[in-house]
């Protein structure tokens, strides 16, 4: 796992900076605020709350001179996590209901509409077997997103906000 992201207190890469090469649970311990950032290598999930909580957004290599307008965070980035590079196959089993119940479908590619492709109103549990994925609240990879790493997710509503439904899913591939 290698990556590098630089956070800046002010817009347009101005003010004090903090260079991060891995996970950081509390950016506020390094900067008073974060208003812009530059991803020099790797892929990062950023969060609007400390300890990898709250709204999430995927940042790939590039510059974000005013990330609040480009990614839609109303507040500062408070924590970040590096997304490992996955070179093998991708596989996730999605379930219609919590605890791996109801319809089940094995997904190995991006799916822009769970309802249209699998006739499920939403995905409420899943088992990520291979790769790293992003689930989205709305079809076509829009709305709030949530990062999934390999493992079992018995009830997606317990680890996100209770009103959140997931309607599309996409693989995180090397940028």
PLM regions and their residue ranges:
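Compact beta-sheet-dominated domain cores in extracellular/mature segments
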Residues: 1-175
